[in-house]
Regions:
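Conserved AAA+ ATPase core "coupling" helix
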Residues: 162, 400-407
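Preference for solvent-exposed, low-hydrophobicity sequence contexts
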Residues: 405-406, 423-427
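Short regulatory helix/loop adjacent to the ATP-binding pocket of P-loop NTPases
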Residues: 143-146, 372-386
Length: 507
């Protein structure tokens, strides 16, 4: 349709020009007619003079589309926003869509950390609560307030003592805490992890009931004789694991228990049920809108050792929010960059699918989809990613991830009007086809700090550029205890890993 309109328009312009050049008083209406006909025929014979060699009229029929940054900004301003909305690359996200969660996908160095910084700044300005699994302590350095916020790390001087026993209020909590520490397995490990959860749950319950501490917990999970552990688990679901003839199975199960429990060996041995409680902190923070933040920073060299512990603590924080009173007008942000590298966080799925009425807002970062599939399985990882309402797609050099992101942005149905001409005459044809709005190869070549923003709701996807924000670095992200003891822990971690791989569990 556009093609024919332009054809007619050019012919009219030609008519005016032709008649003016010849002199309107002399030719009158005939001059206009002659100019129109000549221009019409010239366009028909040589259309490339007007539209170029690839003469085609493209029109979007339906499906996805990507608009310019200025267009997306104009459309966003028409939406209703709170006084200080979360903005992604200068595009305001409607308040009602914040608890549909955020996902930032891109290779290292593309701008994900900047996005976390900018969302966190809005959360702090508004007085929202937050839970942060903090790689390299970047958000801790900018936002931690000593005396108000809480920093959890077994190696940091500012951290309170913590124990999983402090997360239990009744016998019903043993299974939940055990599942936070030993997440459900995928594939062949599913049943084995379940058996390991039975043993951990039984030990947690008995130690909690007897008023024990982390030292007791670690002793039974890692160093006690099988006979002592059997006596402790007597009467629980785990007791069947200790039956005669099940020695080989028990050895395998205890290896799993030990591999997860060794991170508890880094905790204060004297911490117990009266120590700092993540559950109480998060519930009070949510229900009273205290605006306090919980930081769990980790240095890169400590990540393999502490990531299972932090994953368990994040899971416990999620469970706490989900048991708080409903209030979809409050906001409690969960910042988990590179969420697929922490191991499996069991509570991520309920956070994304159930926390909206609690005011929970997940802000997740991801490098490539293979990491998510490895830890959560193909189908469940798809559920997790599709549960995020606001996506920002940055450069992704991984081919599988670029393909996944291209499909996620979507396809569009288009109509092409193609015009061709030759000495024999000219012809016009129409073609209807479906194509990707953006190709994987285009996503692989995006510059740093540029990408495609897709917000749930009526707004189309749009091109955006992230304005760099200089981090403030108000405090040191790590104020470590005796460095020599930390090095000792790191050496022990490596040695324990070798023993588990070569010898299995040794009671």
């Amino acid at each position: 349709m556009l093609y024919y309109f332009l054809w007619f328009l050019y012919s009219c312009i030609g008519a005016v020009f032709f008649n003016t050049a010849l002199g309107q008083p002399k030719f009158g209406a005939f001059g206009y007619l002659l100019g129109f006909v000549c221009t019409f025929l010239l366009h028909h014979k040589f259309p490339s003079l007007f539209f170029g060699d690839n003469n085609a009229d493209f029109s979007h029929i339906r499906g996805a589309k990507i608009v310019s940054n200025s267009k997306l900004l104009a459309l966003s301003k028409k939406e209703k926003h709170v006084e200080n909305p979360v903005t992604i690359a200068n595009i305001a996200v409607p308040f009602a869509l914040e608890n549909r969660h955020f996902l930032f996908v891109g290779s290292p160095g593309t701008g994900k950390s900047q996005l976390f910084l900018q969302v966190a700044k809005v959360a702090r300005q508004r007085g929202n609560g937050a839970v942060i699994a903090d790689l390299d302590g970047e958000l801790t350095a900018d936002f931690y307030r000593e005396g108000l916020d809480v920093l959890l790390s077994p190696f940091d001087k500012r951290s309170p003592a913590w124990s999983p026993l402090a997360e239990m209020e009744g016998v019903w909590d043993a299974d939940r805490v055990a599942k936070s520490i030993i997440a459900d397995g995928e594939g062949s490990s599913k049943e084995w992890n379940k058996y390991a959860q039975f043993i951990l749950s039984a030990v947690l319950l008995k130690i909690w009931q007897s008023g024990g501490n982390n030292g007791d917990l670690v002793h039974y999970l890692m160093f006690s004789k099988n006979e002592d552990l059997k006596a402790l688990c007597d009467g629980s679901e785990a007791s069947r694991m200790f039956e005669d003839g099940a020695e080989r199975m028990l050895s395998s199960i205890l290896s799993i228990v030990s591999s997860f429990a060794k991170t508890l060996n880094k905790l204060d041995k004297n911490a117990n049920a009266d120590s700092f409680s993540i559950t109480k902190f998060v519930k009070e923070n949510a229900e009273k809108n205290t605006g306090k933040w919980l930081f769990m920073p980790v240095r890169d060299d400590m990540f393999p050792m502490l990531s299972p512990l932090i994953a368990a603590q994040v899971d416990i924080a999620i469970s706490a929010l989900l048991t708080s009173k409903n209030d979809d007008q409050r906001r409690v942000f969960f910042f988990v960059d590179e969420f697929a590298t922490w191991g499996k966080i069991e509570g991520i799925e309920p956070l994304l699918t159930k926390a909206r009425k609690k005011g929970g807002c997940a802000v997740l970062g991801l490098q490539n989809v293979s990491q998510a599939r490895e830890n959560y399985g193909k189908e469940r990882s798809q559920t997790l990613l599709s549960s995020c309402g606001t996506w920002l797609t940055l450069r992704s050099t991984d081919g599988d991830t670029a393909e996944f992101l291209s499909r996620n942005i979507g396809d569009e149905d288009i109509r092409r009007v193609i015009n061709s001409s030759s000495d024999q005459g000219s012809s016009t044809s129409e073609q209807f086809s479906k194509q990707r709005v953006i190709l994987p190869s285009e996503l692989q070549k995006l510059p740093d700090l540029e990408g495609v923003l897709n917000i749930a709701g009526p707004l189309p996807a749009g091109w955006v550029s992230i304005k760099y924000m200089q981090p403030e670095r108000n405090v040191e992200p790590f104020d470590l205890k005796d460095e020599r003891s930390i090095e000792k822990f790191l050496d022990e971690e490596e040695q324990e890993s070798v023993e588990i791989e070569t010898d299995g569990f040794i009671p």
